[in-house]
Amino acid sequence: MNICITPHPFGGILAVPSSKSLGHRDLICAALAEGESLVEHISASEDIDATCRVLRCFGAEIEEVADTLPGRISYRIQGGIRKGCTPVTADCGESGSTLRFLIPLGLLTGRSVTYTGRGR
């Protein structure tokens, strides 16, 4: 068998998934900041959804906004963790990253926080 390999120019566009770990951090920093932040081009995932859910539980206002890249999500976040006295339940789903990142943040709320999850 003879095989002939001929060089050919290569081209195209490749959309590489964003780092989920950096996405968590971006959302958390925006939630901690006073005022409005726009976090763009985060790869959609259940873990990111869990982080948004818990940050909302802590008082951040998070709105999904249209993204220009397919498979990505952008968020408009009105930051500021709200202190209170009412106990809250933070559902981390199956996201270990959400749990690890947000346990310390729960202390800032001044509330009793119960963390829940599913899966492994």
Where are the regions that the model predicts?
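Short, structured segments at the rim of ligand-binding sites
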Residues: 1-120
